[in-house]
Swiss-Prot record:
Record: active site: 747
Coiled-coil ranges (or none): 186-302, 393-434, 1090-1132
Domain Protein kinase residues, every copy: 625-885
Source organism: Dictyostelium discoideum (Social amoeba)
Any one Gene Ontology cellular component term annotated for this protein: cytoplasm
Protein's name in the database: Probable serine/threonine-protein kinase fhkB
Biased composition (Polar residues): 1-16, 158-178, 374-397
Pfam families, A to Z: Pkinase
This protein's UniProt keywords: ATP-binding, Coiled coil, Kinase, Nucleotide-binding, Serine/threonine-protein kinase, Transferase
Gene of this entry: fhkB
């Protein structure tokens, strides 16, 4: 330690002798210690009265000839007091002292004789450094800077002097030190700035209010209420702003009152020193120990600060390290000088308050402080009053100012956000007002179309290493031309000249020319199904090959991943393997043994069916298609999604197993003829047929693809009435086209109605028509078991009795589909008999809430489509002209307001078929149904025989009447009687008159004839009456047993009449003979004739009784059979209900 002190002393002596030299200064008169004490105390009191923001260097003025400042007892007391105060406050102020150690310096007791003016720049000498001994006239520190050249004053400091000349500052304009050192208070500036900002905001608000008022004046008087609300909101806003301003002013006044008190306390703690480092340097060994403790605390705090400031920039860290190195260097030099001299070495690069403002950097120059000098005089010959500089307090003030600024910024941001919210609310209100006036809002189209980016689909890797790979980065409409020409995108070199100038073109498969006429879909996934696939278009003369198969000039072919493209020859050198960026594992190659379609799919059956079709058909169309995946299955077979190899078009391939559906060779011939006609079908609302492939066991139909069906649309989305109207009209147009070709669907339901959705609406496609010819009638019923809702009544009746049905059965299915689409529930529940019968009888109810929004036109069309009798059902042409589509009220007047489809006599049989068919639910139910239906069929046969017998009896009666008329022609009297027979119901009185005019010989005969005529006419009436009743009862025979017995009685009467007529004809023959005898015999024969007539009547009665007994026996047998059938039917119902409940 001693060696270090000696080296420090030697170095300080050399530095002292080289840098310090004497200067001639005027001597000052000596001052007594009392006077010095008084001046010191006055200076101390004076310094406490000022609140300086920036620190100033201190110089103690003393007499250099008579006394030394270090021997003054007042100074020693002051040092001890300040040392104690600093030790208490060092922990709170050490952060600032570390930064200010490199820039602050103390000029205490520097004798004026030893300091040259050229060594101290004028910018670093402050008014507080000038001794105050030469100017005792003024109590305040008033001095003049008239002799300071303006060149030595920095530019940032000139604004404090307000000089009139460029060279010197007149002393008349400088009154005090406070006027020079202190700038305008920052808080006042901030207040002014805030006031200006508030004024600007108020002006902006006023302008906005004026604009809104102008807009509202143009609106209707309805806006008056909204204007009043806006005015109230504006008033509330202004009141809030005023309250905020008052609060801010109160806070500012409180801060101004608190700050001077805090500053005075800080001044009292360390009067006489600029910072803690000056205090340590000017003290002895005690100060050195304090300084070491202070360094240790600084190091601990620095470690904590480093943890907190990890997010700071690297530049700030570098600057801090440089400052710390400089500080350590200065401290080491100062400690070296302290061992040899009584005053430490200080850095002359101390920054004054004004130099801090300008942030000027000075070179590290060093001076010594002499221990012998007691006074210091300046070149100006003026003294300055000693002041205290609160350097530590400066940092705290800056922190407070920063906090205030942050608070003010936050408040301003909050105000701006509130204003923006209010403006948005006002704009929304104004837009609502304007929108109520205009019904349509103007929407601008997009200014620029979206920019398409090329997609990397893969590359063509050559097998021969001499060729270059071809990268396939393509847009949708791009084409890569491959060939030998220089204009080709991919130029190839061929020594054998097998490559054409333009050999082939490669483009994306989702840019098909055949699909350009189709508008863009809303759901663009359907348009991009072929995304990632390529098409090769052969335009060469020698040909292009894919996997060894020739494409052909002008033809195209899909290029899949790992396919080999050969140019010129299949075994040539120019071969490329297509390495795709998209792996298409979903494409099934029938030649492979891998099933990647569906795990549950029987792949062997599909493969065998495919092989059989290719063997039996030389030009099999299935070779041109890929099987992609399974998309559906049903009673007919399985449906696959296919891909056309030539152009990548998507199709649907339907596979039907003919052996499973029970088809024969004859039916296949009929089907082939039918589907050859279907190939020519081309309508926008009907699925298009592309090709049909037959084999002995299977059949493949290649048709247009449409994956969405109407059932999913109605289940997932809410479709309005206008869209349903378009769908229904397209259905009617499609069926009108099919019916004109003689094609009947008979199995229409929402699952068979496919659609594609476009921007303009829905495009409907009718599918699965004509496929029922592949299935037998029994299989047809089993296949569609449980879906009688969409079957027309005549279709079900045709399956039972083969009575035939017409084209109107499809209209029934359209009506049920329309009903379901409008209200989203079925028109009737098949399991509920009451509701089912009410629907069948024509009682359609539209009482649900969902029907309240449906128009009357739609309801009327549903009523006309759902009519039981097909003859009274609306036709397609009438439906297309319905007012629901035409919206013509004149046409609607032709229809009745309340239309009810009453069940006609013909439709009663259809109702019977529906009552039986609703029990058909499963295979077991179908077997029971067949037994039940056989009983029904036998009953129907019995009734049909009775119906035929009645018709035959009517014919016999007519013949007998004709014979009577011919026999009566032989006699004039009988002719008269026959005339009476023909007109008996109308002219009975005339007949009586004619009888009186006849001879007395024939009166009895005439009377008998008259009686016969009456009875005959009566019998004819009875016969006609019975015939009508028979028909009525025959239709209701299966329902009511009582009616069946009633029918039995009527049949008895009918047979009685028939026998009576037959006997009566015989009597007429006798009468004719009697009449002839009357012409030749006497009047006595009349009695004989009367007796004969009576006998004949008796015989007739006997015969009638015998016939009645015979017929009664027959009817009893029939009744027994029918009762047995009814009992069997009841037992079937009981068994079936028990089976279903279990």
């Amino acid at each position: 330690m001693s060696q270090d002190i000696q080296t420090q002393n030697s170095y300080s002596d050399e530095l002292y002798s080289s840098q310090i030299y004497s200067t001639q200064q005027p001597q000052q008169p000596q001052q007594q210690p009392q006077q010095q004490q008084s001046t010191f105390s006055s200076q101390q009191s004076q310094s406490s009265s000022y609140d300086f923001i920036y620190s100033t260097p201190q110089i103690h003025s003393q007499n250099s000839q008579n006394s030394q400042f270090s021997q003054n007892p007042l100074y020693d007391d002051f040092i001890h007091s300040t040392q104690n105060s600093y030790s208490q406050r060092v922990s709170s102020q050490r952060s600032y002292s570390q930064k200010s150690s490199s820039s602050q310096i103390s000029f205490s007791q520097i004798p004026s004789s030893q300091i040259q003016s050229s060594q101290i720049p004028s910018s670093q000498i402050h008014s507080s450094q000038i001794p105050s001994s030469q100017n005792q006239s003024s109590q305040k520190s008033q001095f003049s800077f008239s002799q300071i050249p303006s060149s030595q004053i920095p530019s940032s400091q000139k604004r404090f002097f307000q000089s009139q000349n460029d060279d010197f500052v007149p002393s008349s304009q400088v009154t005090s030190l406070q006027d020079i050192c202190l700038p305008q208070p920052i808080q006042q500036q901030q207040q002014q700035q805030q006031q200006q900002q508030q004024q600007q905001q108020q002006q902006q608000q006023q302008q906005q209010q004026q604009q809104q008022q102008q807009q509202q004046q143009q609106c209707q008087p309805q806006q008056q209420q909204t204007q009043q609300q806006q005015q109230q909101q504006q008033q509330q806003q202004q009141q809030q702003q005023q309250q905020q301003q008052q609060q801010q002013q109160q806070q500012q006044t409180q801060q101004q009152q608190q700050q001077p008190q805090e500053d005075d306390d800080d001044y009292d703690d360390y009067d006489g020193y600029d910072n803690y480092e000056d205090f340590v340097y000017n003290e002895g060994e005690e100060g050195e120990e304090d300084y070491e403790d202070y360094e240790q605390e600084n190091d601990d705090d620095d470690d904590e600060d480093e943890d907190d400031d990890d997010d700071d920039d690297d530049d700030d860290d570098d600057e801090e390290e440089e400052e710390e190195s400089q500080q350590q260097h200065i401290r080491s030099r100062a400690l070296q000088s302290r061992s040899s001299q009584s005053r430490p070495l200080l850095r002359s690069g101390f920054k004054s308050p004004i130099s801090r403002l300008s942030q000027t950097k000075t070179s590290p120059e060093y001076i010594y402080i002499s221990s012998q000098s007691n006074t210091h005089t300046n070149q100006l010959g003026q003294s300055s009053q000693q002041t205290n500089s609160p350097n530590v307090h400066f940092n705290s003030l800056q922190q407070k100012k920063k906090q205030q600024q942050q608070q003010q910024q936050q408040q301003q941001q909050q105000q701006q956000q509130q204003q923006q919210q209010q403006q948005q609310q006002q704009q929304q209100q104004s837009q609502q007002i304007i929108g109520s006036q205009s019904s349509q809002s103007s929407q601008l189209p997009p200014t620029q179309p979206p920019v398409e980016v090329p997609v990397n689909l893969g590359r063509l890797i050559p097998i021969n290493a001499s060729h270059i790979p071809i990268n396939l980065n393509l847009k949708r409409e791009d084409r890569i031309v491959v060939g030998r020409s220089s204009s080709c995108d991919a130029r190839l070199i061929d020594n054998y000249l097998t490559i054409s100038g333009k050999h082939c073109e490669i483009y994306r498969a989702d840019n098909l020319t055949c699909l350009k006429h189709i508008p863009l879909c809303k759901d663009k996934t359907d348009c991009h199904k072929n995304f990632g696939m390529l098409i090769v278009h052969d335009i060469s003369s020698n040909g292009s090959y894919i996997n060894g198969e020739l494409i052909g000039n002008g033809k195209t072919r899909i290029l899949r991943s790992d396919d080999i493209l050969s140019l010129g020859h299949p075994s040539g050198d120019l071969k490329f393997i297509f390495e795709s960026e998209f792996q298409f594992n979903f494409i099934l190659d029938i030649k492979d043994n891998v099933n990647n379609l569906n795990e549950n799919l029987d792949y062997k059956k599909l493969r065998t069916a495919y092989d059989n079709a290719r063997i039996e058909n030389k030009n099999c169309a299935l070779r041109d298609y890929y099987f992609v995946k399974e998309i559906g299955s049903g009673g007919y077979g399985i449906v696959y999604e296919g891909l056309y190899k030539l152009n990548g078009k998507r199709v649907a391939i339907k596979h039907i197993d003919l052996l499973k559906n029970g088809s024969t060779s004859k039916s296949m011939e009929l089907v082939s003829k039918e589907y050859n006609a279907l190939k020519n079908i081309k309508h926008r609302n009907v699925i298009e047929f592309f090709d049909i492939v037959f084999s002995s066991t299977d059949c493949f139909f290649i048709v247009e693809l449409a994956t969405n069906d109407l059932s999913n649309l109605l289940r997932k989305r809410c479709v309005d009435e206008d869209d349903i109207k378009r769908i229904c009209k397209q259905l009617l147009l499609g069926f009108n086209y099919l019916h004109n070709l003689g094609i009947v669907h008979r199995d229409l339901k929402p699952e068979n109605i496919l659609y594609n959705e476009f921007k303009q609406g829905f495009s409907i496609k009718i599918t699965d028509f004509g496929l029922s010819s592949f299935v037998e009638e029994s299989q047809y019923l089993q296949t569609f078991c449980g879906t009688p809702l969409f079957f027309a009544p005549e279709v079900i009746a045709n399956n039972f009795f083969s009575n035939g049905y017409g084209k109107s059965c499809d209209l029934w299915s359209i009506g049920v589909t329309l009903y379901l689409s409008l209200c989203k529930y079925k028109p009737f529940i098949v399991d509920c008999r009451d509701l089912y019968h009410s629907f069948i009888n024509g009682n359609l109810g539209f009482t649900s809430k969902k029907w309240a929004k449906i128009s009357n036109y739609a309801k009327d069309l549903v009523r006309r489509l759902l009519v039981i009798d097909p003859e009274h059902r609306i036709t397609i042409k009438e439906a297309l002209n319905h007012p629901w589509f035409t919206q013509d009220r004149r046409f609607f007047k032709k229809y009745p307001k309340h239309y009810k489809s009453r069940a006609q006599p013909k439709t009663q049989f259809f109702v019977e078929c529906f009552n039986v068919y609703y029990d058909l639910k499963s295979e077991t139910g179908f077997i029971c149904f067949r037994e039940h239906f056989d009983n029904l069929e036998t009953n129907y046969a019995l009734f049909k025989q009775n119906f035929d017998n009645n018709n035959n009896n009517n014919n016999n009666n007519n013949n007998n009447n004709n014979n009577n008329n011919n026999n009566n022609n032989n006699n004039n009297n009988i002719n008269n009687n026959n005339n009476n027979i023909n007109n008996n119901n109308i002219n009975n009185n005339n007949n009586n008159n004619n009888n009186n005019n006849n001879n007395t010989n024939t009166n009895n005969i005439n009377n008998n004839n008259n009686n016969y005529n009456n009875s005959h006419n009566h019998n004819n009436n009875n016969h006609n009456h019975n015939h009508n009743l028979n028909n009525h009862n025959h239709n209701n025979n299966h329902h009511h047993n009582h009616n069946h017995n009633h029918n039995h009685n009527h049949n008895h009467n009918h047979n009685h009449n028939h026998n009576h007529n037959h006997n009566h004809n015989h009597n007429n023959h006798n009468n004719n003979n009697n009449n002839n005898n009357n012409n030749n015999n006497n009047n006595n024969n009349n009695n004989n004739n009367n007796n004969n007539n009576n006998n004949n009547n008796n015989n007739n009665n006997n015969n009638n009784n015998n016939n009645n007994n015979y017929y009664n026996n027959n009817i009893n047998n029939i009744n027994n059979n029918i009762n047995n059938n009814i009992n069997n039917n009841n037992n079937y119902h009981q068994q079936y209900t028990q089976h279903t409940t279990m």
